Amino acid sequence: MTDIKRPFSNPLALAILVLLYERPMHPYEMATTLRERGKEKSIKLNYGSLYTVIEQLLRANFIAVREVLKEGKRPEKTVYELRAAGEVELIDWMRELISSPVKEYPMYEAALSLLPVLPPEEVIDLLEIRIGLLDKTVEEIDEQDRICREMKLPRLFSLESEYYKGVTLAELKFTKDLLSDIRRDAGGLRTGWTEMRKHLLSIKAEARTKETAMAAIRKTQKKKGKP
């Protein structure tokens, strides 16, 4: 895992640097190009965040204003270009991202770390729903891959899809295995979970009892005129 701290961690900043590495562009052209290439499937994109990141890259001296275009009564278009420092950052950042795994924080992982909030019986049903959705996702990826093959697109353009499929299949296998383990109480998983949930609910009930008692005391004191 890498501990390097960079000025930016937003994938959109990386995408903007790559676009300007190709040629100078204005923001609308950047957004259009990213969408035409299907990059919104891998990079969260909206105009508001695009302009914000551009301003941040300007302040970091990674990009610069090349020119401002004015065509008739249309709004001005600011064209940006990549600076030398921006190119250095881009290449170094790409090398780091490809070579060094980074700890990420997926929501599914977060939910798994907090499972005692829900009973095992309910989670079994929820995992079945997730498995169905993951199966559907794999089917959609396969269909996209089929279209790419029919169009005879270079494999380079489908690498992100291959990665996404690999991650999805890994999650699907994990989820199926987890569902099986819960059902058969493998390693005492379901038993321990049930006990942990009972303990959690006991703590919650005790806290509410104390809160109710304190509220009653405050109410009594208020009636007696005590602070």
Where is each model-derived feature located?
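Extended, low-aromatic, Leu/Ala- and acidic/polar-enriched alpha-helical coiled-coil segments
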Residues: 161-169, 200-207
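Amphipathic alpha-helical dimerization/coiled-coil segments
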Residues: 91-139
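Long amphipathic alpha-helical coiled-coil segments
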Residues: 182-197, 225
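Amphipathic alpha-helical coiled-coil segments and their boundaries
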Residues: 120, 127, 154-157, 161, ...
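Acidic interhelical loop/turn segments
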Residues: 142-163
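Non-transmembrane amphipathic alpha-helical segments
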Residues: 127, 134-148, 168, 175
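Short, contiguous alpha-helical
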Residues: 165-185
